[in-house]
Swiss-Prot record:
UniProt-recorded name of the protein: Adenylyl-sulfate kinase
Keyword set, alphabetical order: ATP-binding, Kinase, Nucleotide-binding, Phosphoprotein, Transferase
Keyword flag rRNA-binding: no
Taxonomic superkingdom: Bacteria
First-level EC class: transferase
This protein's GO CC annotations: cytoplasm
Reactions this protein catalyses: adenosine 5'-phosphosulfate + ATP = 3'-phosphoadenylyl sulfate + ADP + H(+)
Pfam families: APS_kinase
Residues engaged in binding ATP: 20-27
A GO term, aspect molecular function: adenylylsulfate kinase activity
Keyword Nuclease included in the entry's annotation: no
Organism: Deinococcus deserti (strain DSM 17065 / CIP 109153 / LMG 22923 / VCD115)
Amino acid sequence: MTATLQRESVGTGRVVWFTGLSGAGKSTLASALYEELIARGEQVELLDGDAVRENLSKGLGFTKADRDTNVRRIAFVAGLLAKHGVTVLVSAISPYAETRREVLANLPNPTEVFVDAPLAVVTERDVKGLYLKALAGEIPHFTGVSDPYEAPENPDLHLRTDRISVQDGLKQLLDHLGVNA
């Protein structure tokens, strides 16, 4: 039996989906927004791609099919929460445009945020050295190096984290979401 999400919402929740390369700043911005919304008394949950992969998608690899399955699992949980009035922040690479479009089309009140930084910047930010290993061919299926990252063509918000601070990004997020001070 396959469960699908419908756009009908019983609550006033929404899903803010942060997508971008590893190291672009998705988790940083999502966490900053999470803290701000909690401080304002909103019901909010943060679904981090790494945590979901560890807990709900353990055993999945990094093939396109496995990545798509992981994204669909995240979207399923996000949709359930949002339908009950929760603002859900999703921080996940979600590398394939078609899969992102599919899941966003079935989520209540979705906002796609493209967290963008050039490869040179994310490589410099990478304290584990994963990009350098991937560029040297030591890590197969690495998004942005040996596997594609398909940038959103028309995201709701495009944040260039190599050009703005976390505080500026947070302000743009709050303005876009209509959650002004």
